[in-house]
Amino acid sequence: MSNLSGTDKSVILLMTIGEDRAAEVFKHLSTREVQALSTAMANVRQISNKQLTDVLSEFEQEAEQFAALNINANEYLRSVLVKALGEERASSLLEDILETRDTTSGIETLNFMEPQSAADLIRDEHPQIIATILVHLKRSQAADILALFDERLRHDVMLRIATFGGVQPAALAELTEVLNGLLDGQNLKRSKMGGVRTAAEIINLMKTQQEEAVITAVREFDGELAQKIIDEMFLFENLVDVDDRSIQRLLQEVDSESLLIALKGAEPPLREKFLRNMSQRAADILRDDLANRGPVRLSQVENEQKAILLIVRRLAETGEMVIGSGEDTYV
């Protein structure tokens, strides 16, 4: 079997367990893994009896060894923790460890569903549960799902995402029970997610009309919260992803001293982004100024960065800068 790779062995195993079981296995793999296995499977021509027997035999041996090691490891870990921490604290800690181990995939399945199917699956749940689910998804998937809700539900869920502080342990069991019915036993991660940054990242990926409506709805509830979301929606550091033509247009509007101070607090890739869009002479002068200018107060840096972002927004609103990604632009 030396000529068979791990992927080849996996393909052989998947082809022996039937379509339904293979589909269940695929649900627990990453997109890249599914792609690799699918490509290998499509290229299969013939599997000899010896190859099949060898693969199944190896799988059986490894499965038995893994199961035995897993049981012994858990028992060993419990014994060590009890001796170190006492029965009560050890039990609590072990429960957390095993729960984390068993729920690392979270509700990742929803990331690979069609947005319409995912939206249909969760739209009738309580808005807080929907918000809790969405903060665990890729931002683009969450935005696509939100776009399929009616406006009232979309605004309610986004407000809950913006004020989300994580799942409290007391509520975790109840929430998991609800989600088990929806997601075939998938559980939520405990890590703290959500909040203003998450809300901003999701809104950034929504269509302009929906974005404006959501911000308006949040502002009616809490003006300060809405402003925090707006402040997070496009950061100075995000300029590193803006196209060169837009950066060149921005440079026509920004004062050189303001840019110097703003870039004092920027990462090297962003500095280089600006420098390579300048004339050679202007870039050389700015490099010298950045190297020779002494320390600048953080408050000064932040003020200049905010001032530049105001220019960015103005140029984006007039269509002179493109600062979004994908089909939609942020205005």
From Swiss-Prot:
BP GO terms, sorted: bacterial-type flagellum-dependent cell motility; chemotaxis
Keywords on record: Bacterial flagellum, Cell inner membrane, Cell membrane, Chemotaxis, Flagellar rotation, Membrane
Annotated Gene Ontology cellular component terms: bacterial-type flagellum basal body; plasma membrane
Family of this protein: Belongs to the FliG family.
Membrane topology type: Peripheral membrane protein
Cellular localisation: Cell inner membrane; Bacterial flagellum basal body
Gene3D superfamilies from the UniProt entry: 1.10.220.30
GO molecular function, one term: cytoskeletal motor activity
Protein name: Flagellar motor switch protein FliG
Purpose: FliG is one of three proteins (FliG, FliN, FliM) that forms the rotor-mounted switch complex (C ring), located at the base of the basal body. This complex interacts with the CheY and CheZ chemotaxis proteins, in addition to contacting components of the motor that determine the direction of flagellar rotation.
Name of the gene this protein is made from: fliG
